[in-house]
């Protein structure tokens, strides 16, 4: 018989519901629903009352690291479904004016460094991207997906075969924050 000891507890706000099925924690709030799969042999997450608890069967550095990661992931899920997250990016160009637009699930960058063919970046499901002037705003409830979308946009404007000290064009992350 394995003895499980509780290591962390996250209290759920009143307007948030949580369910656990097959190692998948689903958090539902006023902005939507987010989920994360928590699977490990020595650490388990479960729901008891109005809180999410994380327990371990061993007490070592490995399991302490997993407990801390799962704790922060759960807090981010709760924060995402109650407040939401927002990333701000800046369109920066000096040589060639680029045109940025959103088409479906892609962000299209045209005339980047005078290139004839447009570059595209995938927008991950659950993210809303808007372009106003030289700013791009990414909104959503899952911080991982928003970060992945921001990374896709930055990677689409990566400069190769030019001197990066001279050609400083691109789209760069300014800040990521929680909506208030």
UniProtKB/Swiss-Prot annotation:
Pfam families: Ribosomal_L6 (PF00347). GO terms for biological process: cytoplasmic translation. It comes from the Archaea. Keywords: Ribonucleoprotein, Ribosomal protein, RNA-binding, rRNA-binding. Gene3D superfamilies: Ribosomal protein L6, alpha-beta domain. One of its GO terms (cellular component) is cytosolic large ribosomal subunit. One of its GO terms (molecular function) is structural constituent of ribosome. Belongs to the universal ribosomal protein uL6 family. This protein binds to the 23S rRNA, and is important in its secondary structure. It is located near the subunit interface in the base of the L7/L12 stalk, and near the tRNA binding site of the peptidyltransferase center. PANTHER family: 60S RIBOSOMAL PROTEIN L9, 60S/50S RIBOSOMAL PROTEIN L6/L9. This is Large ribosomal subunit protein uL6. It comes from Picrophilus torridus (strain ATCC 700027 / DSM 9790 / JCM 10055 / NBRC 100828 / KAW 2/3).
